[in-house]
Amino acid sequence: MFPRVSAVLPFRPLSRLPLCSAGPEASAATVVPLASPHGTVRTKCNIQRYFGTNSVIYSKKDDKSVPACEISKETENQGSTKENKKKDLVNIIKGMKVELSTVNVQTTKPPNRGQLKSLEAAIRRLQKSPEDAPQKSKSLSPELVAAATAVADSLPFDKQTTKSELLRQLRQHEEDSKAQKDGEKPKISFSNIISDMKVARSSTARASTRPVHQIQFDEGADDFVDREETADLRKRFRKNIFKGKRLNIFELKPVTEEAPETEAAPSLWDVEFAKQLAAVTEQPFQNGFEEMIQWTKEGKLWEFPINNEAGFDDDGSEFHEHIFLDKYLEGFPKQGPIRHFMELVTCGLSKNPYLSVKQKVEHIEWFRNYFNEKQDILKESGINFS
C-alpha cells in the first residue's frame, strides 16, 4: 500500500499557479512535502508517476493544477474504498464458512428411530463377528486363518471385518463340500424352481377367439391325458379298406399273374431302320455342343464323367474270374509243349482288360478244338494230347 498524502501539508502558492479557490477548470494542484526544498512543486503528472495507481482518483488535464483539498479528499476516499473492499472480502469468507457449517449441521441431524435401530443392529453384528470368528475358525485349518489375517492386514480399511468376511466365505465352501460328500441334496435355487414350472393355459383366451357356432371343448391342464385320448380316437377311426364288408357294387375279376414278357433283342433290320429314321429327321448342328453330343453317341468322344470302363459290357463276373483261368485248362496235357503254350495263353488273357470272361473262355475253347482236330498229326509226332 502506498502512503497517504496528508491533507494538512502547507502549501505555497506561486505566481504562476492558481490558489485553492480555483474553479473545476484548474489543473492538478501542487503539493509540497515537508522534506522538499522551497520552490519545488509536484504536479499531478508527478504524483501519478510516483504515487498514483488508480486512474479513477484524478482526471488528467494538460498543465493545470488541482486544489490540495480535493487531493486529500480523494486519497481518503481511495483508502476508505480499499478498506471497504477488504471488509467485504472478509465478510464473504465468513459467510461461506457459516454456510458450510450449517450444511454440516443439517447433515448431522439425528436420524429416525428406524435408522437408529438398523445402525445399532449393524454395529452389534460387526461386534459379534470378530468375537465369533475365533470360535468358528476352529473348523478351518490354521494356515487358512493365517493367510486370511495376512490379507486383512495388507488392506488399509477395517481389517477385522475383512478377516471375518474371508473366514465366513471359507466356512461356506467347507460346508458345501461336506454336504456334497455326505450325499445331501443341494440347495434349491430360484432358477431351478422357475425352470421346472409349467405355464398353465387358460381356456378363456382360446374360447373368446372361436366363433359362437362351433362346439367348444374343455381343455384339461394335463397335456399328457389329452394326447392319450387323441391317440385312442385315432386308433378307433383308423380303418382298413380290405377288412370291411363288401358291397358287391363292382364285379370281382380273378387276378391272374401273367408271366413277364421277355423282351427280345432288336434285329439287325430294326437297328438299321432306326438309323435311317434318325438320319431323315437329323438337322445340321447349330453349335459345337450339339456336335460334341453327337460324337459322344457315336463313340468318338469320352462320356462324362470320365469312366475307364465306358463301353465295356461285362456279364457281371467277378474280378478273380478274369485273372485265374487255370481251371479252364482241364483236358490239355499236363506237361509238354502244348501245356506250356496254353499257360502262356492264359497268362496273356488274365492281363487283358478289354475282353470279358466269356470271350476269354471262348478263346481257350478254340485252342481246345484246334488241338482235337489235329490229334492224328500229334500222334504221328509222338505227342499225347489227352
From Swiss-Prot:
Pfam family, one: MRP-S31
GO molecular function: protein domain specific binding; structural constituent of ribosome
Glycosyltransferase keyword on record: no
Predominant cellular place of this UniProt entry's protein: mitochondrion
Cellular localisation: Mitochondrion
Keywords: Mitochondrion, Ribonucleoprotein, Ribosomal protein, Transit peptide
Coiled-coil zones: none
Entry keyword annotation includes Nucleotidyltransferase: no
CC annotations in GO: mitochondrial inner membrane; mitochondrial small ribosomal subunit; nucleolus
InterPro entries: MRP-S31
S-S bridge residues: none
Record-stated family: Belongs to the mitochondrion-specific ribosomal protein mS31 family.
Subunit structure: Component of the mitochondrial ribosome small subunit (28S) which comprises a 12S rRNA and about 30 distinct proteins.
Protein name in the entry: Small ribosomal subunit protein mS31
The gene coding this protein: MRPS31
